[in-house]
């Protein structure tokens, strides 16, 4: 489903997620905070490895990067993690360097900034103001 279809068919769920994307759980789903709790043990393993390749969903990568880079958890759902990209982390002393290497794959931009109007009674066009352009 597109963002527009979700906003149209499930306007209350769409608004509730917009209001608290960090903690919101879709029915039978996980919140970002649930994912953070699930991957914390994995993060401890990652810190002990020399080289590691992780292939994952954007949401999981947002959680990992937020924890590794020490970003505030409130920023987690809005971190830009581009599709079809190799993200290289280099650990040196107490610093982490991040490099993004985009692969030549055409795709839509799925990054959505935090909306300002999260009211459950908002109009469809207001709900979709921050929806990224797609074909």
Where are these regions (language model features)?
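Short, active-site-adjacent cap segments at secondary-structure transitions
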Residues: 60-62
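Generic beta-sheet signal
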Residues: 45, 49-58
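Short glycine/proline- and acidic residue-enriched helix-loop micro-motifs
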Residues: 13-31, 115
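Generic structural signal for well-ordered alpha-helical scaffold segments
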Residues: 36, 40-47
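Acidic, low-complexity terminal tails and accessory targeting/binding regions
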Residues: 1-8, 33, 48-50, 66-135
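A general structural motif at alpha-helix termini
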Residues: 10, 18-21, 39, 80
């Amino acid at each position: 489903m597109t963002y527009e279809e979700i906003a149209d068919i499930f306007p209350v769920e769409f608004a509730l997620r917009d209001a608290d994307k960090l903690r919101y759980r879709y029915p039978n789903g996980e919140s970002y905070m649930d994912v953070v709790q699930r991957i914390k043990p994995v993060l401890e393993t990652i810190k002990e490895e020399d080289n590691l390749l992780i292939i994952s969903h954007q949401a999981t990568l947002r959680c990992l990067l937020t924890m590794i880079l020490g970003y505030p958890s409130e920023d987690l759902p809005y971190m830009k993690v581009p599709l079809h990209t190799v993200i290289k982390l280099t650990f040196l002393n107490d610093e982490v360097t991040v490099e993004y290497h985009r692969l030549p794959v055409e795709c839509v931009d799925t990054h959505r900034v935090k909306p300002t109007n999260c009211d459950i009674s908002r109009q469809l066009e207001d709900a979709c103001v921050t929806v990224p352009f797609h074909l």
